[in-house]
Curated annotation (Swiss-Prot):
Competitively inhibited by UDP-N-acetylglucosamine 3'-phosphate, with a Ki of 7 uM. In vitro inhibited by covalent binding of fosfomycin and the fungal product terreic acid in the presence of substrate UDP-N-acetylglucosamine, with an inactivation rate constant of 102 M(-1)sec(-1) for terreic acid. Pfam families: EPSP_synthase (PF00275). It catalyses: phosphoenolpyruvate + UDP-N-acetyl-alpha-D-glucosamine = UDP-N-acetyl-3-O-(1-carboxyvinyl)-alpha-D-glucosamine + phosphate. This is UDP-N-acetylglucosamine 1-carboxyvinyltransferase. It comes from Escherichia coli (strain K12). It comes from the Bacteria.
């Protein structure tokens, strides 16, 4: 397995170009299964999960090509099963189910894999599809969905806010007969992006970005060209990198209005932040950040995917800060690893109490999930001495060329190929 070797401390400064959002690209790739004409998707990040999704679409019979943009022609899809060998590494595969059953009347997906953070069950996806008229069976490790004729529009009240299930229901409802209303829908920018992609293909959707999405079913979806929005979590990660190293950064190809909660906390930490239409700059003026209190919650509140990075910020900040995680259980696996580097933290149920220290020291640490591993790499950039981050395949699932981008900001980082 590959590792990163990071030599610190360095001040990170310069410019970084933000990639397309993984969490929008993946649902959009699967939503392309609904289209009866070719689609072109631009600004798709080069990531392991994206490659796996493209491979899966090919196995279903779609023609998939990448030359800058990703081109998908799903006219000849003739396989309706997403097999275990592809699904086991990536939970996003469940998003194939809604489009398959909506367009072809049948679909089956092996139960998914992915990061190990907490319970992320597929029950909300299943109950949503059942309410649209699909028959669901769980057999031999597969979720099997079928319907005679078309799905039927329904009024669906989500038990809890779920980005994944909102995507599944919204995609399936585009080809259902009649109107579907999703109440307590997720409001994330990536949901809005997926909806806008579907609208480009001819879907009738309104209310995306609010907690009530209305979908009027249409008979078919055509083709089109669509550009994936910038990755707000990658943007936030690089802003934190500059903040903890007392540096200065400009993030290009960003979308500031998707990051309001994160930018507010960075300002509280003492960062000087400016935004333009598609850029964000942060300048610490050489100062150490101040500790901040953070509580994660569904959008538009503070995103859980930025929690590990802000835990790190607090651990090197002036003062004591509290980080409370309300979205996923079991999402503090980075804290013991940061403690190995000299961080002072206590975990009390779903809160980390962070006591800022002047400096961290390099150590051998292990990545446990995608965002936690990014925080360990950033910690290595500012720690004194050498840090080796093991199991970085987690990072490759969500960050495009993170070592190249950090190196361009002045980091001393190299990838060590595993045996």
């Amino acid at each position: 397995m590959d590792k990163f070797r990071v030599q610190g401390p360095t001040k990170l400064q310069g410019e970084v170009t933000i990639s397309g959002a993984k969490n929008a690209a993946l649902p959009i790739l699967f939503a392309a299964l609904l289209a009866e004409e070719p689609v072109e998707i631009q600004n798709v990040p080069k990531l392991k999960d994206v490659d796996t999704s493209m491979k899966l679409l090919s196995q279903l019979g779609a023609k998939v090509e990448r030359n800058g943009s990703v081109h998908i022609d799903a006219r000849d899809v003739n396989v309706f099963c997403a097999p275990y060998d592809l699904v086991k590494t990536m939970r996003a595969s469940i998003w194939a189910l809604g489009p398959l059953v909506a367009r072809f009347g049948q679909g089956q997906v092996s139960l998914p894999g992915g990061c190990t953070i907490g319970a992320r069950p597929v029950d909300l996806h299943i109950s949503g599809l059942e309410q649209l008229g699909a028959t669901i069976k769980l057999e031999e490790g597969y979720v099997k969905a079928s319907v005679d004729g078309r799905l039927k529009g329904a009024h669906i009240v989500m038990d809890k806010v779920s980005v994944g299930a909102t995507v599944t229901i919204m995609c399936a409802a585009t080809l259902a007969e009649g109107t579907t209303i999703i109440e307590n829908a997720a409001r994330e920018p990536e949901i809005v992006d997926t909806a806008n992609f579907l609208i480009t293909l001819g879907a009738k959707i309104s209310g995306q970005g609010t907690d009530r999405i209305v979908i009027e079913g249409v008979e078919r979806l055509g083709g089109g060209v669509y550009r994936v929005l910038p990755d707000r979590i990658e943007t936030g990660t690089f802003l934190v990198a500059a903040a903890i190293s007392r540096g200065k950064i400009i993030c290009r190809n960003a979308q500031p209005d998707t990051l309001d909660a994160v930018l507010a906390k960075l300002r509280d930490a003492g960062a000087d932040i400016e935004v333009g239409e598609d850029w964000i700059s942060l300048d610490m003026h050489g100062k150490r950040p101040k500790a901040v209190n953070v509580r994660t919650a569904p959008h538009p509140a503070f995103p859980t995917d930025m929690q590990a990075q802000f835990t790190l910020l607090n651990l090197v900040a002036e003062g004591t800060g509290f980080i409370t995680e309300t979205v996923f259980e079991n999402r503090f696996m980075h804290v013991p690893e940061l403690s190995r580097m000299g961080a002072h933290a206590e975990i009390e149920s779903n809160t980390v109490i962070c006591h800022g220290v002047e400096k961290l020291s390099g150590a051998q640490v292990m990545a446990t999930d995608l965002r936690a591993s990014a925080s360990l790499v950033l910690a290595g950039c500012i720690a004194e001495g050498t840090t080796v981050v093991d199991r970085i395949y987690h990072i490759d699932r969500g960050y495009e060329r993170i070592e190249d981008k950090l190196r361009a900001l002045g980091a001393n980082i190299e990838r060590v190929k595993g045996e």
